[in-house]
């Protein structure tokens, strides 16, 4: 908002804090009865977004966006309702990558993972580094996302399909890795509370498939390592593993979007702000605070990669380039 007001001195944006607890429910309550007090709305999850569409509280934005829709890597299509309109535009994106501990790979004489790994390649890398380094090859956190959502990366399936046969090969791969002891046991992770961050930071696991938010966690961990009496993690990132036939850079993610109140008296001004947030200027402002913009570019990637503690290798910079982002939960009236 500050960046927009700097370039639009005639506009004042006042923020309203609805709190983080049950935010989308609070937002729906605020908009009830045709309340037009709020102009621009932050959309934080798909179920809440679906509810607001059904209640008629959001202005259709299809055809009103000034940024090329293709730059959103397919996300706008996934936000499109049954009536053919999308009612929100992403400005922030968190997508998944693979983190790896360079020191573990170096000491074991294992080549680093690459930016173009099939699921079979990922499995082989997990097994190789486990055998040669004596640590877990990867840690899959206990969320469903870490295993189930490999299945949506071919662009042909979603988790609301109703038929889940397509998930079988991915579960078989991970269960085989678990049976062979090259990854932590799921049950033991649940009972012990072993967290992916701790396992990766202390060298129990050579790799970790996780969202881009973990980058800032590791940057903070390394910045405070000396004062906390721990060793920093020499980490890198590469693109997410993909099924055969899917292009490298296919990944899963979540977005935070902006919408316009259908009852706003300042729709034109609100739409201009939404368009600015989706523009290159808006994306640079998002990147400047260490957050990944929904519309990335070489310029925003350079901003992100120039932050203190970001891996300096070319592969990590290239890992920021995605070709398709599949939402962890697609738009559906069944989403919850």
Language-model-detected regions and their locations in the chain:
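Extracytoplasmic/periplasmic substrate-recognition and gating elements
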Residues: 108, 180-182, 223-292
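Extracytoplasmic/secreted envelope proteins and their assembly/folding machinery
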Residues: 1, 24, 28, 46-49, ...
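C-terminal capping/gating helix-and-loop segments adjacent to ligand/active sites or protein-protein/ligand interfaces
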Residues: 81, 298, 312-336
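Extracytoplasmic "Venus flytrap"/periplasmic binding protein-like
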Residues: 3, 7-72, 107-109, 199, ...
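Extracytoplasmic ligand-binding clamshell segments of periplasmic binding protein
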Residues: 21-26, 152-234, 238-243, 268
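Beta->alpha turn/N-cap motifs
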Residues: 42-47, 143, 210-218, 256
């Amino acid at each position: 908002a500050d960046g927009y007001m700097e370039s639009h001195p005639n506009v004042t944006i006042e923020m309203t804090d609805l709190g983080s607890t049950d935010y989308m429910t609070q937002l729906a309550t605020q908009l009830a009865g045709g309340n037009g007090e709020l102009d621009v709305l932050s959309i934080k999850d798909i179920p809440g977004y679906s509810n607001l569409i059904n209640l008629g509280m959001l202005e259709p934005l299809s055809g009103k966006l000034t940024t090329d829709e293709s730059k959103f890597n397919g996300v706008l299509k996934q936000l499109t309702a049954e009536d053919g309109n999308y009612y929100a535009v992403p400005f922030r994106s968190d997508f998944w990558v693979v983190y790896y501990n360079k020191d573990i790979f170096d000491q074991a004489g294992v080549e680093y993972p690459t930016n173009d790994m099939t699921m079979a390649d990922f499995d082989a890398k997990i097994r190789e580094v486990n055998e040669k380094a004596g640590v877990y090859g990867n840690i899959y956190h206990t969320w469903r996302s870490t295993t189930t959502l490999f299945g949506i990366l071919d662009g042909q399936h979603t988790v609301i399909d109703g038929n889940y046969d397509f998930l079988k090969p991915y579960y078989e791969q991970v269960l085989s890795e678990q049976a062979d002891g090259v990854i932590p046991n799921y049950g033991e992770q649940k009972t012990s509370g072993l967290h992916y961050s701790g396992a990766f930071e202390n060298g129990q696991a050579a790799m970790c498939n996780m969202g881009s938010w973990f980058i800032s966690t590791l940057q903070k961990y390394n910045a405070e390592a000396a004062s906390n009496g721990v060793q920093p993690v020499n980490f890198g990132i590469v693109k997410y593993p993909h099924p055969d036939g899917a292009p490298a850079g296919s990944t899963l993610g979540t977005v935070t979007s902006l919408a316009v109140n259908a009852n706003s008296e300042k729709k034109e001004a609100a739409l201009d702000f939404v368009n600015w947030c989706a523009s290159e200027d808006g994306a640079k402002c998002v990147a400047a605070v260490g957050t990944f913009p929904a519309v990335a570019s070489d310029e925003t990637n350079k901003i992100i990669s120039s932050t203190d503690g970001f891996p300096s290798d070319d592969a990590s910079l290239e890992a920021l380039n995605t070709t398709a982002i599949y939402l962890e939960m697609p738009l559906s009236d069944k989403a919850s």
